[in-house]
């Protein structure tokens, strides 16, 4: 199977996670951010992730891909209950996290930005909706304090380092991509249980953290 992705994209990370958790091989293909032609040819519009199944048919939508791959062998992993507290935490933090993440994505060495045109496409599109990246970076300190406070609240909710609620569930698929991308932000205080969970999930899913390129 082949998975077409952007490295920074949280929806792509969700799809990548299930392959790592189940130890199923997948061929990753990173599309350029300004390449509309390839995904449109596959699924009719510019979006990622896109899974090319073994029968060569294409499947978009991250959670559809997660459920498809999880059930392929008849032994699904994501059988745990979801937590309303985790859902509420994600809703709160996702409300502002992009103000920290988007301007940092734009400065980072992701393969989807490997041409100047691809990087410019991302900057132009995201600044139009999120605001000027230089302004957002200038306001980082307050947002970093907010995220550090919110991570302290999350620390109390983590049951085990290998599954946020004690048993693997969709909450892990929703939570880890955000934590992984937040490793791109320098200066965040990571509480110990959150850090252990983040690091353990990175190993389980075979997805790299971004700490070495933090801004």
UniProtKB/Swiss-Prot annotation:
Segments forming domain GST N-terminal: 1-77
The UniProt record lists the keyword Transcription: no
A Pfam family matched in the record: Glutaredoxin2_C
Disulfide pattern: 9-12
InterPro entries per record: GLR_AS (IPR011767), Glutaredoxin2_C (IPR007494), Glutathione-S-Trfase_C_sf (IPR036282), Glutathione_S-Trfase_N (IPR004045), Grx2 (IPR011901), Thioredoxin-like_sf (IPR036249)
PROSITE patterns assigned to the protein according to its UniProt record, in alphabetical order: GLUTAREDOXIN_1 (PS00195), GST_NTER (PS50404)
Keyword field contains Transport: yes
Any GO CC annotation of this UniProt entry: cytosol
Alphabetized UniProt keyword annotations: Disulfide bond, Electron transport, Redox-active center, Transport
SUPFAM superfamilies: GST C-terminal domain-like (SSF47616), Thioredoxin-like (SSF52833)
GO molecular function, one term: glutathione disulfide oxidoreductase activity
Family of this protein: Belongs to the glutaredoxin family.
Physiological role: Involved in reducing some disulfide bonds in a coupled system with glutathione reductase. Does not act as hydrogen donor for ribonucleotide reductase.
Protein name in the entry: Glutaredoxin 2
Gene (name only): grxB
